[in-house]
From Swiss-Prot:
It catalyses: urea + 2 H2O + H(+) = hydrogencarbonate + 2 NH4(+). SUPFAM superfamilies: Urease, gamma-subunit. This is Urease subunit gamma. It comes from Micrococcus luteus (strain ATCC 4698 / DSM 20030 / JCM 1464 / CCM 169 / CCUG 5858 / IAM 1056 / NBRC 3333 / NCIMB 9278 / NCTC 2665 / VKM Ac-2230). Heterotrimer of UreA (gamma), UreB (beta) and UreC (alpha) subunits. Three heterotrimers associate to form the active enzyme.
Length: 100
């Protein structure tokens, strides 16, 4: 199997998000990379499912809460930008203050 660099990056996000979700299910609070991985993964999958950019931008701030992450992580992430593949092409999804 030969994957392009962009596909490898997407696969890495999936693996990182899966690991982060497993840790979260064990009751651990997420660190910065884990929180980014989960938010990124959910936005990419939402785009793949056909949700609109506007919908993802508002929904993206509900994926994780301050209670889900370690102290200070929410303050470190002021914005998440994901280049996601939609049914009609690739678009940039920006979520401001994604952890509330």
């Amino acid at each position: 199997m030969h994957l392009q660099p962009k596909d490898l990056e997407k696969l890495l996000v999936v693996v990182a998000a899966d690991l982060a979700r497993r840790r979260q299910q064990r009751g651990l609070k997420l660190n910065h990379p884990e929180a980014i991985a989960i938010i990124t993964y959910e936005l990419m999958e939402g785009a793949r499912d056909g949700r609109s950019v506007a919908d993802l931008m508002s929904w993206g701030s509900t994926i994780l809460t301050v209670d889900d992450v370690q102290e200070g992580v929410a303050d470190m992430i002021s914005m998440v930008q994901v280049e996601a593949t939609f049914p009609d092409g690739t678009k940039l999804v920006t979520v401001h203050d994604p952890i509330r």
